[in-house]
């Protein structure tokens, strides 16, 4: 028996114990060594006997027996003949599964180039030979000869000759030279290459050349040559002489009934190759005419191409059904390929799926499992129990009992299932909370019951959703399911650290209803001795739920020892709140309950409970809230009737007023005072404002009601209108939706996002007429179409994010860096969007945090900032804190715990082995899908808020202006002429309270440093047009303003007023393209006026679409507008702008018209202009080299001649390019930019994501650097290398006292970063499989199996989570084994030598311990 076990073990020997996977080119000998025989015939199987043909594609002699332990002719059967080779049919008697692993080969009659190395761009063969791909193809496909050995002729090696040229040459020189065609020619050239010599030549060229393109080309070639030298690949192996044949069971041929066969396409492709190869062999034996042989060789080349990668060159070979055949390359790439279909995701056993329904009586850690399903899933366990209990003697008997469903089976099932967790999964699994573990409770029926509180995490509802059940089998799996995946362990969301087990809908409504108060309710003013009595009073009808009463409340407060002490107070509260207090856990303060609890407040309750009392209490509390909420929601009897949608009387007045305003604008438009665009914008603003007013009136009307209090006086209180309660509590619906029910629907959007200017003045209660309905269908349908498209987009974004971040794991506790990023609160306008405490909570301080204005340390360095520290920060009004960040972490492969900070889902410092990369990717990707699915909920209603046109300050304080330039107009007001002016209001402590951006042309009412009081308007501007402001006074002189060429005159029919419209460059006639319309200012004599303090003439270039209302020669003052540029009309902002925006940011795409930034600091001047461009010069003040850049003339510049700029300043407006920010402002700035821009999109949608997740992705985008100075290291200049590798090399060089390698960080988009990863397995399974594998094979790459994906693919535990320890142990064992091996190698002679040295050290007391250690190290 023992032998049998050992034998089976030996049979299933897989190379388990490897640490690296290497890929390379296969030499012909290697292919022969894999092979078990040559396939000589194209036959497959005999159609009558279904037996494989000998020497054919399915030959049993080559590939192994068709039946287990049985040869083909049937002479040897059974295990006893194991290993015998039958002398009759030549088949080895063994298991049939060897047909899955034994390969064959085909000896090709003529060499064939491997299409991947030929056609996969850049062509490797082409690069190596330094020949264009077209030429190589002409040789390979027998159109030209190539000179291999020129001999004494005047031909050159590698020269192409046509048929005629070849014949001429042959006549002239006879056999002096050698020229061939086809793959053999290419092969012999490759074989003759001297790689080392080529490398040397190239290195010399690289030193001598100055042109950038040449350098790039040489570097590329040099890298390829070096790769060949280092990897030990031979170039001629890119041309094959032997073709491997896939094992037959991987390309099956299955007989169908009716004599037909279902076959894999590969068999067809192989058959083609074998047929052509055999024909070629015969032709060569017969010494057929050259032209026929040549044709056959070409066909062989084409058939091998098709087998390897069909359709890569020429037309794809198609099968009988006109579909292209699936080649070997197609087998591995794409979603259906080997990598993604079989290696990264597999179907699993022991699983089932069913519809879900509500389980309101379950505990949080339970789910209801239908008995039928449980019986099927736990079958083997039941069999085992039945046998061990003696109810069944054999498995067969047990099976019968289970199928009969005997009574005993149900008892055993209940026992088996007890405390055996199961996993529930709802697709799409967008984040890790999409799979959670529960304890099953057996139920009747066929639907799985799910606890309502976990619905938010699964994003599940009960409208027909299905969920899958999986059974963890091994003890370890059960342990992990219970300890890590149990729903009770996942109370907080990993995306933002807020509770995700939060009541919603009915529960919220019930709790809200309980905790509302009412004026003059029944039993108001009662004195009750405890909540129990309050409940009694409510149940017996002596008091209403909402009545205001006095009750003795006992709270439990922690004392100094950390034990709870009771404290009893008489509190003013309501009966309902007292009843709710009965379920509160010990240690919660009553004031959290003594308020009207909406969804946010309940979430805060659970959060507080978690932070104060821990997980167990929170879970029980959440369950209790749910039961109570359901009960009281039912008691409240809330329902929605049409009369609940109360339409305010004022609505019609507001609408009439708005219509009046619109009519006025229309009149102005007809008199030519405003343009079409301005009219459109103003009309939309009017309606948006009207809509807001209607909504406000409606909400006031709906939310309050007047009642008579106990004294008999009228008093206002919150209304008990059902619709209002649902929205106010956060149970369902929002103000925007109620506005559509009872206010007015408002403006609608067209599918392209522009707004239809006719609003829908009706609401859903009044009903829409045909036109209104039609207008609203527009936007609503777009919403539905978008949803379908964007789900896919968002899923793809998540996939790219996961792929780029998959190998980022916490690998050590502290990297010891002092770097970090500075956090300060985000202030937009007058309100603090994100307070500092939210930004630094759960981060580690990078430096001591000092009390403002003193040297007192508030928070020491390396402290994890938790809620208590946040309170200290708030109390001391700290303005900014430097915190550790993933981006600045110094760990080489991975991140350290201190730089990451708190594990958001657990609330403590993150553990080692946590896969933070994947968590980050999921946290960013998950709301993407939710948001994309949420486009159409407001029915396409355009939420265009009225544009701001002034700054009204909200706090008292002092004004500070940054980046400001202005002129004073003749009214004495300041007019801004700078474009990125920022206005901040600071309080007496110097803390920023408000922050505004002011546009060009703003009129300021206050100067820098002026005191302001709340409510003052300090600046105003026209939001719809941008003026061009004159900085000097004088007379207008038109330059290049030619009617019909550069401008068109618009005369208004009604008023006769004319204005000049500047045309866009693209729309002008050819003659006008080079003209630059401008307004020059001259004095009365017609001389140029200079701008103050410079020698630049005051000349203002007019961009396209600008409107000039002045006439030539008009007189103007300082600060007057010369022209107006209408601003584009507003589109709707929803995540549509959002998801593509996020993708663009993470892909680090350059925007269409990027902002131009100053490359160096210095003084701006303008040089000689060319046809369409201006020459911008920046002269550094410290006397460096002047920088010059050509800028298209149509770009509006933010700088004037003679102005001082800092490196990285804006020169021309536009979207900033992250690459520029990185280059000019550094890593911190680019991190901040990407984090803020991504957060902006999510914040608009009200989604909370912690910054550190985005930082994790940014770290991965910054993984690579470009070498700028390599000195004598292993790198090449201009090479792209992982920063971690450069750091390792630099540490070594520092120790040796050599100069450090210099490099420049590079920002890669996530797709590029994924493909540029060190691991080729990970990259190949992501995208562009062919390209990645070709590159890796040529370079002979090694995959160290560091990331998660590579390990999943080779079938190991991932090096994260519980697999982290496993991998660490493996590494340790490997290290020890190596050390042991080294130790064994010591011989007696070595030992003697060491002894002598040690004696020497012992004799010489001056030698230090360090030397001994050094010696030990060297050994």
Curated annotation (Swiss-Prot):
Q: Which UniProt keywords apply?
A: DNA-directed RNA polymerase, Magnesium, Metal-binding, Nucleotidyltransferase, Transcription, Transferase, Zinc
Reaction equations catalysed: RNA(n) + a ribonucleoside 5'-triphosphate = RNA(n+1) + diphosphate
The positions annotated for binding Mg(2+) are 461, 463, 465
Q: Give the EC number(s) under which this enzyme is classified.
A: 2.7.7.6
KW Magnesium (keyword) present = yes
CDD domains on file: RNAP_beta'_C, RNAP_beta'_N
Molecular-function annotations in GO? DNA binding; DNA-directed RNA polymerase activity; magnesium ion binding; zinc ion binding
- What's its top-level EC category? transferase
Q: Where does Zn(2+) 2 bind?
A: 815, 889, 896, 899
Q: What function does this protein fulfil?
A: DNA-dependent RNA polymerase catalyzes the transcription of DNA into RNA using the four ribonucleoside triphosphates as substrates.
Q: Which PANTHER family does its entry note?
A: DNA-DIRECTED RNA POLYMERASE, DNA-DIRECTED RNA POLYMERASE SUBUNIT BETA
Name of protein: DNA-directed RNA polymerase subunit beta'
Protein species of origin: Actinobacillus succinogenes (strain ATCC 55618 / DSM 22257 / CCUG 43843 / 130Z)
What broad taxonomic lineage does this protein's source fall under? Bacteria, Pseudomonadati, Pseudomonadota, Gammaproteobacteria, Pasteurellales
